[in-house]
Amino acid sequence: MRVLQICNKAPYPPNDGSSIAIYNMGAGFIANGTELHVLTINTKKHFKPDGNIPQEYKNNAHYQSVYQNTDVNAFGALFNLFSSQSYFVSRFYFRKFENALVAKLKATDFDIIQLEGLFMATYIPVIKKYSKAKIVLRAHNIEYLIWERHLKNESSALKKWYLGLQTKRLKNFELETLKHLDAIVTITDFDKSIFEKEGFKKPIYTCITGVDVNDYKKKVSEQKKPKTIFHFASMDWMPNVEAVEWFLNNCWKSILKQVPDAKFVMAGRNMPPHLKKVNEPNVLVIEEVENSRKFYNEHEIMLVPLASGSGLRIKIIEGMAYGKPIVSTAVGAEGINYTNGKNILIANLPKDFIKAVVDLLKDDSKRIELEKGALSFAEQEFDNGKVVSGLVGFYKNELNA
């Protein structure tokens, strides 16, 4: 079976949720004997030099990247008002990338073309023109749902109007795209149910993001910093910013009153300026984490206080694989078949979130039990080889690939 992954960001190094999801699936394809080809936009925002990519991966993945600037800009956002297409989508279309795609399709016959995320569906017309491969959307999220959730909390009238317009266009594009797919691969059953409700009748397969759990279990010698809670995520994704703001505004002061020596560490690239300048007691900001394993092992309790978003939080999978006790909202843990109180703590209201964090800070035995439960759950659910093997079987059995 020959698969082409078309990506909106370079997957290596896998240092954020979406690149981890893309890279790990590709690694799983290769391990399962699938001939993999990767064609990706290498964005200005998330630029990753080809020279830093291991030669073995480049060869095995027939890797090719095309540099493009997908940054949001005022002119593009304004000019888009005179278009019928969502700006969220149009900023991922480039003639240069299309030319590279056409050359790839002319040179190689594929069985499956897997679009990594909705935005790459803008290339479906050219795919259909030059290939007979089955077209599959790997839906990392329900994109319009993220923005519909965000709009409920938007206070600026002008911004709400503009984002409302873009969200409506995005939803129209997302639903129109369904008509041109042969299958969908979702990351959660919740997202699968949304596509089914929207009338998609063709095969849908839920394939959670897998990880190499044995690799995550490797420890480093750094001593754990007691009474530390942390949020570690890409801070150029709006729901993550909202999550940190919610925690700081509604939870942190109450936690600190009950556990005065507690420390909150928020980490992640592209930290917004207003969060860099946060002046709260016992709060530390780390903009760039050089060694994720060291960071996870040093800090005790992981927080995922998301109020919006869709899809799966890869950081929760990573956290569980590292054996971290995690406190999350229900939205944050969507798509994971957790058992509340056994392998994660779920809390949605500020008072419940505060209590969950304080209990773990004060009760070492409870924290240790949650750590064991998280790691055991990760070993059972997230093994990458098993995860991707199931998808390969789906492609062969359902799509005759």
Residue ranges and their predicted role:
Residues 8, 75-87, 135-172, 234:
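Acceptor-binding helix/loop patch of EC 2.4 sugar-transfer enzymes
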Residues 1-64, 108, 254:
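N-terminal subdomain of nucleotide-sugar transferases
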Residues 164-167, 171-218:
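Donor nucleotide-sugar binding/catalytic pocket of nucleotide-sugar-dependent glycosyltransferases
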Residues 315-318, 325-329:
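Short hydrophobic beta-strand element within catalytic cores of glycosyltransferases
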Residues 366-380, 387-393:
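A short, well-ordered alpha-helix in the C-terminal region of glycosyltransferases
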Residues 206-298:
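Conserved catalytic-core segment of nucleotide-activated headgroup transferases in glycan assembly
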Residues 182, 294-311, 322-325:
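Acidic donor-binding loop of glycosyltransferase active sites
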Residues 344-351, 359-365:
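Conserved acidic donor-binding segment of nucleotide-sugar-dependent glycosyltransferases
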